[in-house]
């Protein structure tokens, strides 16, 4: 009898060890999320995929601007960059920060999606924002979630549940979306909490589903869509996108590591109506479309929060420790990197009457 019990115990312990080893990337990331205590981990471990920069990136003349020091010289701010579509970027940095050193964009990663869909639309004759995703996602072809459209996903009106985040629950789609082992499968398991298009509720699944749709539109997957249509046409440095497993799917909802200057370039592309030099990346009118409030949330547009006024809207991408503000009217963007909440005065830097052109600049 004791021998039987011992054998059963040995088998069960072996199975437990095997399961732990097989899902080690999940448990490793889950521990990092848990240790962050509701904040953002300093860096998530695991495999990554390189996104290559453009041979002709959005040009910027970079200058360290002493006018920013009195504003930014607090204990919470690490980097502050102000960019103008005319081609200059003023910055202030704490001694430990570098405008060229990649940072985890955290939730800024999802800010790539609205301009990416514009870039994809620019290559197509049919309108893609209002096409039900069932046309492109076989998994939802016969599912009620197949009625969701990319526009609703960008508006955070898909109806998909936000989900409770319990990092150590390996059976939770929400935990799997954060830690793997399959980001896309996890997003496709997000349940409907509301009829599509009826309710505003941010869900991390929205970004990941959008990545699947973008990949299907491109025909070669999300990584190729992002590389070929957006990042590889504007960025000055490599970026590292987090993968769920080796040679797996990119996390569209978080965690891409890129240089602060390239996050600013994203803002300036939008601020300049989707144009780099003489090349149009986004269709005419797409940026204006991004500034239109959703039917149920007046402070949320296409993939971005909205501030400012109807005549002079400001697009915002806000995530813990990161804030990207974009003014299409002023043709400016401001990136803040720090700890805690961003300062209230940041958007003043978008206004030419308050913050003018730097006197000296150098290539950056």
Residue ranges: model-predicted function:
Residues 237-240, 288-335, 343:
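Active-site Gly/Thr loop motif
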Residues 1-98, 106, 121-128, 155, ...:
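N-terminal leader/targeting segments and the immediately adjacent pre-domain N-terminus
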Residues 103-129, 153, 210-214, 266, ...:
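Active-site SXXK
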Residues 97-100, 168, 191-196, 206-208, ...:
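Flexible glycine/proline-enriched surface loops and loop-helix/loop-strand junctions
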Residues 123-161, 189, 216-254, 258:
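Active-site helix/loop module of the DD-peptidase/beta-lactamase fold
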Residues 156, 206-213, 252-276, 321-339:
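Active-site-proximal alpha-helical segments within enzyme catalytic domains
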């Amino acid at each position: 009898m004791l021998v039987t019990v011992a054998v059963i115990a040995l088998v069960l312990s072996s199975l437990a060890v095997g399961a732990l080893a097989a899902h080690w990337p999940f448990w490793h990331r889950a521990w990092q999320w848990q240790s962050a205590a509701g904040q953002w981990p300093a860096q998530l471990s695991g495999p990554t995929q390189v996104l290559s920069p453009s041979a002709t990136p959005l040009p910027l003349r970079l200058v360290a601007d002493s006018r920013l020091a009195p504003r930014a010289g607090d204990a919470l701010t690490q980097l502050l960059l102000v960019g103008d579509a005319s081609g200059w970027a003023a910055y202030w940095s704490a001694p430990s920060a570098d405008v060229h050193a990649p940072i985890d964009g955290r939730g800024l990663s999802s800010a790539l999606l609205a301009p990416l869909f514009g870039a994809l639309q620019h290559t197509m004759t049919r309108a893609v924002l209002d096409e039900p995703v069932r046309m492109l996602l076989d998994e939802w072809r016969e599912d009620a979630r197949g009625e969701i459209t990319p526009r609703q996903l960008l508006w955070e009106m898909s109806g998909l549940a936000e989900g409770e985040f319990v990092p150590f629950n390996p059976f939770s789609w929400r935990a799997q979306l954060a830690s793997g082992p399959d980001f896309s499968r996890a997003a496709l398991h997000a349940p409907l909490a509301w009829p599509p298009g009826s309710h505003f509720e941010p869900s991390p699944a929205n970004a990941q589903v959008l990545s699947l749709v973008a990949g299907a539109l491109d025909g070669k997957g999300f990584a190729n869509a992002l590389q070929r249509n957006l990042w590889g046409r504007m960025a000055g440095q490599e970026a590292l996108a987090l993968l769920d497993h080796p040679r797996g799917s990119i996390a569209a909802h978080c965690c891409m590591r890129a240089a602060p200057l390239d996050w600013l370039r994203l803002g300036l592309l939008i601020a300049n109506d989707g144009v780099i030099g003489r090349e149009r990346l986004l269709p005419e009118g797409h940026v204006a479309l991004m500034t239109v409030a959703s039917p149920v949330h007046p402070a949320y547009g296409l993939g971005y929060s909205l501030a400012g006024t109807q005549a002079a809207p400001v697009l915002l991408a806000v995530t813990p420790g990161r804030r990207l503000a974009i003014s299409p009217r002023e043709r400016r963007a401001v990136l803040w990197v720090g700890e805690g909440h961003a300062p209230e005065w940041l958007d003043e830097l978008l206004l030419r009457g308050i913050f003018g052109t730097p006197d000296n600049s150098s290539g950056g």
